[in-house]
Regions:
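Membrane-interfacial amphipathic/re-entrant helices at transmembrane-helix boundaries
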Residues: 2-90, 118, 131-149, 174-179, ...
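Membrane-embedded helix boundary and interhelical linker motif in transport proteins
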Residues: 62-65, 69, 78, 100-162, ...
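Transmembrane helix-bundle core of multi-pass membrane transporters
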Residues: 62-67, 138, 166, 170-174, ...
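Helix-loop-helix "hairpin" substructures at the membrane interface of multi-pass membrane proteins
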Residues: 83, 233-311, 334-340
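Alpha-helical transmembrane segments within multi-pass membrane transporters and channels
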Residues: 130-185, 192, 339-344, 348, ...
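Transmembrane alpha-helical segments in multi-pass inner-membrane proteins
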Residues: 145-153, 290-297, 301-373
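Cytosolic-side transmembrane-helix boundaries in multi-pass membrane proteins
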Residues: 1-58, 219, 270-277, 281-284, ...
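Single transmembrane alpha-helix segments in multi-pass membrane proteins
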Residues: 72-122, 162-177, 273, 326-335
């Protein structure tokens, strides 16, 4: 197309004019590249140890640059990777349901919340010392951690199957109605958690609905491992969390790519109508996908409650985490869920650890800002996600 560059005589839309001049695809990409380069240089070279930062109440965190404080850098990097493993466990289930069923399962965080409390109650019931908000790890055997995991996954899988069969199946194809149904389920679950959990409290102590509780890792995980990496010793429990995330990823890959059921699910993600037209009972496939997705939320709840805690309002938090991972990685993509989790983990941990804070706070809230910056960058250049495909 021959373009007349004279002002007032150039035909076409504004977007065509911009494309003709080569602005789109140049300035935004250059700005994104500059931001990424600056972020890397900031962490590696620029940032200072704790002290004044520009006057006033602003100060840097306790971490120096990677060059001047490689040990702290290595610990933050490991924290980011292990947190990403937990994100992947939870978000991969959300991605599976979203990718196949086109259901934005707003109750996914509620599966996590309920699963965490169920695991806590089971572990407390199994241990004669379980009369308080938490057990010490030396009091917990491997079986006393594995049993709550198995019970929690089974209960949440059954609950998820009930939600799918009784509520979602009869509204298949009505995306808005299904989203509203899952919102209703999440509200009901959150209220019931406040009303009934935790059951085990210290003797004589009042019970407040939705108290923060945690379950204990097995005793053998409560030590530090010398990784020979910048002389860093790191928590074995967090390394176990990383190993569990990798194991879940391998298991999902083998299931999705090496079994007939996985092949059908991947076909359903790509083209539900054609899969159904080939004589495959798509309702059974949907049920399997929903059960697996709910089970992964429960699995992640046990791991997350072991490493941290579970409390009311965390359902919304983990739903948001899952949404971010799916938006960044791409809907229905296992590799996208892994990469999205890793990127989110890196952004979350490094921004919280290396950016300035105010007053006596130990960390910053820039992780929230940079999370949305990550979303904006991905949506600007890959609206379908890094590994998603256009319809």
């Amino acid at each position: 197309m021959k373009l007349d560059r004279g002002i007032g005589t150039f035909a076409g839309s504004v977007a065509e004019r911009i494309r003709a001049w080569g602005v789109v695809g140049t300035v935004p990409r250059a700005a994104a590249a500059a931001l990424i380069v600056f972020s890397i240089l900031y962490v590696l070279v620029i940032t200072k140890p704790a002290g004044e930062f520009g006057g006033g109440n602003w100060r840097t965190t306790n971490f120096g640059s990677a060059i001047h404080d490689p040990g702290s850098f290595a610990r933050v990097l490991l924290d980011a990777v292990t947190f990403a493993a937990l994100l992947f466990i939870v978000a991969s289930g959300f991605s599976l349901i979203f990718g196949l069923m086109r259901v934005v399962n707003m109750a996914h965080g509620s599966f996590y919340l309920l699963g965490g409390y169920i695991a806590y109650e089971v572990q407390q019931s199994m241990n004669p010392e379980g009369q308080g908000f938490s057990l010490q790890s030396f009091q917990v055997s491997t079986w006393e951690w594995v049993a709550p995991l198995l019970v929690t996954v089974a209960v949440i899988a059954g609950f998820g199957l009930g939600v799918q069969q009784l509520l979602l199946r009869w509204n298949q194809g009505q995306d808005l109605r299904q989203a509203l149904i899952t919102i209703a389920v999440s509200i009901i679950v959150a209220d019931q958690v406040i009303a009934h959990f935790p059951r085990h409290v210290p003797e004589g102590a009042p019970r407040f609905g939705g108290n923060a509780v945690s379950i204990a890792w097995p005793g053998w995980t409560q030590r530090f491992v010398d990784l020979k990496l910048f002389g860093v010793e790191y928590s074995l429990a967090r390394l176990v969390m990383l190993a569990l995330g990798i194991a879940v990823g391998i298991a999902l890959y083998l299931w999705l790519y090496k079994t007939r059921t996985g092949m059908v699910i991947r076909a359903g993600v790509d083209d539900r109508q054609m899969t159904s037209a080939l004589g495959i009972n798509i309702h059974v496939v949907f049920a399997i996908a929903f059960v697996v997705g709910a089970s992964l939320a429960a699995f992640g709840a046990v791991v997350g409650t072991s490493q941290g805690n579970v409390a009311q309002l965390q359902d919304g938090q983990w739903l948001l985490y899952s949404l971010v991972v799916v938006i960044v990685g791409g809907m229905g993509s296992l590799l996208g869920a892994a990469v999205g989790s890793l990127l989110y983990g890196l952004v979350f941990m490094f921004s919280a650890s290396y950016l300035p804070t105010t007053g006596n706070e130990c960390c910053t809230q820039y992780s929230i800002v940079f999370t949305f910056a990550l979303l904006a960058l991905v949506l600007a250049f890959r609206p379908q996600g890094l590994f998603g495909r256009t319809a």
